Amino acid sequence: MRVTDFSFELPESLIAHYPQPERSRCRLLSLEGPTGALTHGTFTDLLDKLNPGDLLVFNNTRVIPARLFGRKASGGKIEVLVERMLDDKRILAHIRASKAPKPGTELLLGDDESIHATMTARHGALFEVEFNDPRPVLDILNAIGHMPLPPYIDRPDEDADRELYQTVYSEKPGAVAAPTAGLHFDEPLLAALREKGIEMAFVTLHVGAGTFQPVRVDTIEDHIMHSEYAEVPQEVVDAVLAAKARGNRVIAVGTTSVRSLESAAQAAKSDLIEPFFGDTQIFIYPGYQYKVIDALITNFHLPESTLIMLVSAFAGYQHTMNAYKTAVEQKYRFFSYGDAMFITYNPQAIFERP
């Protein structure tokens, strides 16, 4: 399959630079996987689409202020984007500079350049950086870091983004991008879902900056997926198996929840799904056999991205590309701060290729 098969025309005006004033009032495009039928509504229509006993699986990662500005001690300006926190002193990061720093290079970070760090090693495209500061890494990031808004949101981050670019149930710091399907859930909607008897479970996948990296090969089978850390604890496994046993659906909130659950299913030795704690490089594209997910809530993704490939593997290639064409025509808002889709599984998708 060619990467260009997943391209579509997107006017710049449809890229959302700010979220809706009210989280749950975004638009919702529903795609019936087996038939391709589309219906238009608002996000709170989920209440009518879910049945008592259905299980929603959320990603409770929390976005860290992962973008740092400063300079090398020798003078050159740098921008640091944390990929992951290694421990209380060290990070793995992307560094943008006129000349890549060498091991031993001292970095002066923050507006007043008061935070000192050392680049200690290079791992491929990533740099290991150690802070020379008594505070834990997370405290330093909270003090001097900027929210790492995606590259297509073409504006500086604002104070409000510290909460807006965060799900209301975020709990475990470590992501450098929000699991954006979850941004549409507010407390009143969560309460209404619970009242209806909708079950909820929480995985953790710390979204890395790799989620925004373009696919740089022509043939998607040649793409090497970036690695991200995921946790699927026993209580999630129990909730999934219980939902399946009673004939209810497992509904992933976002592609990160999909990748967490499907990673746990792939690694399972005997049962449908087993607990999973570790890095995942799962790459889902047409031809993939889904094991756990019955429905998916997700935002609209970039052309030629691994995420539109994941959706195509779930709903079917033709149904997905038609839904995107319709979304553009109907002026839905795209990407992280944009509108959402509710998609049910198409069992024929596994047989469909572009």
Swiss-Prot record:
HAMAP family named among the record's database cross-references: QueA
Gene: queA
Recorded superkingdom: Bacteria
Key words, A-Z: Cytoplasm, Queuosine biosynthesis, S-adenosyl-L-methionine, Transferase
Assembly and oligomerization: Monomer.
Entry keyword Protein transport: no
Cytoplasm in keyword set: yes
GO cellular component, one term: cytoplasm
Protein family per UniProt: Belongs to the QueA family.
Protein name: S-adenosylmethionine:tRNA ribosyltransferase-isomerase
